[in-house]
Each structure stands twice: as C-alpha cells, then as structure tokens.
C-alpha cells in the first residue's frame, strides 16, 4: 500500500501529519490508540476523533437521521428504511469525518447526493433486503485518516462468535435524544441458530440477515443504516463491513443487521468492484 506524506498540520498547538492513502485502501483506523481495549449508543463509550473513518452522518434539512458507510470514493451504503419514504436525493447531505454532531472539526467534509438506489425487493413491513446505495455528486478526491472506505467481507465469511462494533450517534436509550458525539459499542456476532431462536415467528432470514448479542448493548434510534464491523485477522486486522443496522426489539438487546456479504453481487452491479 502506498502512503504519501503531503502536508504538516498544526492542531490545537500540536503537530500532526496528514496522510494521503491510495484509492485501494480500506478498513484502516490510522488514528486509533493501539493500547485501547475494546469498549464494553446503548451501553457504549464515546469514540475518539477519527476512530471510524468510513462512518457518515446522513442529514435531511440539516438534521442527522441515519448512519452509513463510505464504500468507495463516490458511494455510501446505508439501510433502505432510511431513505425509502423520500428518495429525492436533493434533500440529503452526507457528512464525513464527523465526531461532534453539532460542531464540525476543520477536517470534516460534506457532499450532496446525486442518486439513491433502494434494493428492488426491500419490504417496509418486514424490513427484509434493508439496503440502499447513495451516489455522491462529487467524489472524495483524497482518502485521509478521517475518511476512507470500509472493507467488504468475502462471500463465505460468517464471523460467528467474533466481536463486532456498532457505531453511531443514536439515542442512548429508547425514546432518548441523539448523542452529540460518536459512540461505539461491542457485541458478539450470533450464530444463525441463536439468531433465529432469539427472534421467533420467521422474522429472521439468516441468508440475508445477521444478529448481534445483547448484554445491555446495542443500536437505537439514529443508528439505523450505520455499520456493524469486525476486525478481520485474515486481513491484518482491517475492518470489514459485516452488517447494516436494521432493527431490534427496543434498545440495548443486540440487534438485527442486513448481511452485507449476501448483497455483494448486487452492490458491485451498481458501484463496480468493492474493496476487500
């Protein structure tokens, strides 16, 4: 991977280096403190600035409504239920590099949306096929520590029993207000059998959905469309987009996510090859 030093910045009186990453870069967290242990959103902890460089804030009329992830220099992936009711791209704004939902740091950038593609088999009743793509009007010219794409999973990866991260500005409890700062929470990827037992009455299709464990942690209002990600040891710990936050029963009891690997062919038919 080529990394080119391009400029030296002074931030809060301290020197920091801005790095320009190749366009095939994905799933890195250059600013993470390597000594940090995983945190134990509902039950989560505030992320550090720049910890999750693919996470975006989707805005409508200036207000955060959903999360999403950068998957290349011009496309965002999110949940279909975030945009299904209003598919006019002109009403949305995508904000990248954001930590403080109310006050943007100087590296934060925003983009208008050119087009929206909702999965043709999305059901607003069952939330099946809860996946959508948003094309930005202007490309992201340069990947930096603060915004770069997430990696995609391979088709045969299940990640069962591995620790995953849900990231967003969602409410800390049911009925609560959005968080001001980006939060992260960890939970285990459940096996398909445990997932089906947890949500009865045929609510789960393991071929296209994945579940995370509860333990008083999970996504809530405002986290929808955001990433559920796992560090992949087979790829030097790069972070892989396993799921898109879709739904749950209340808050703090894990969640149900759209299984990204199940839609890889559909995604690539719209945006071209994904990064993995």
What are these regions (language model features)?
Residues 81-85, 97-102, 137-142, 170-173, ...:
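Acidic glycine-/aspartate-rich tracts in secreted/extracellular proteins
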Residues 69, 74-75, 129-130, 146-148, ...:
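Extracellular regions of mammalian proteins, primarily the fibronectin type-III
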Residues 2-77, 91-98, 276:
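Protease-domain processing segments flanking chymotrypsin-fold serine proteases, especially trypsin-like
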Residues 28, 34, 58-59, 76-79, ...:
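Conserved H-D interstitial segment of serine endopeptidase catalytic domains
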């Amino acid at each position: 991977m080529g990394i080119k030093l391009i400029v030296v910045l002074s931030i809060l009186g301290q020197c920091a280096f801005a790095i320009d990453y190749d366009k095939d870069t994905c799933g890195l967290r250059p600013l993470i403190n390597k000594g940090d242990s995983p945190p134990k959103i509902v039950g989560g902890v505030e992320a550090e600035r720049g910890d999750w460089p693919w996470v975006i804030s989707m805005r409508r009329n200036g207000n955060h409504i959903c999360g999403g992830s950068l998957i290349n220099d011009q496309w965002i992936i999110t949940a279909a239920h975030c945009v299904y009711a209003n598919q006019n791209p002109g009403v949305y704004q995508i904000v990248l590099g954001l930590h403080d939902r109310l006050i943007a740091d100087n590296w934060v950038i925003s983009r208008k949306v050119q087009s929206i593609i909702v999965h043709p088999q999305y059901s607003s009743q069952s939330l099946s096929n809860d996946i959508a793509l948003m094309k930005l009007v202007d490309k992201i010219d340069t990947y930096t520590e603060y915004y770069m794409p997430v990696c995609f999973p391979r088709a045969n990866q299940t990640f069962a029993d591995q620790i995953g991260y849900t990231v967003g500005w969602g409410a800390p409890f049911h009925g609560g207000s959005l968080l001001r700062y980006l939060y992260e929470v960890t939970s285990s990827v459940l096996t398909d059998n445990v997932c089906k037992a947890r949500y009865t009455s045929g609510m789960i299709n393991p071929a296209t959905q994945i579940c995370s464990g509860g333990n008083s942690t999970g996504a809530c209002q405002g986290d929808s469309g955001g990433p559920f990600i796992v560090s992949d040891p087979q790829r030097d710990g790069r972070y892989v987009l396993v799921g898109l936050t879709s739904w749950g029963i209340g808050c703090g009891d894990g969640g149900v996510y759209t299984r990204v690997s199940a839609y890889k062919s559909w995604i690539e038919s719209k945006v071209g090859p994904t990064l993995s």
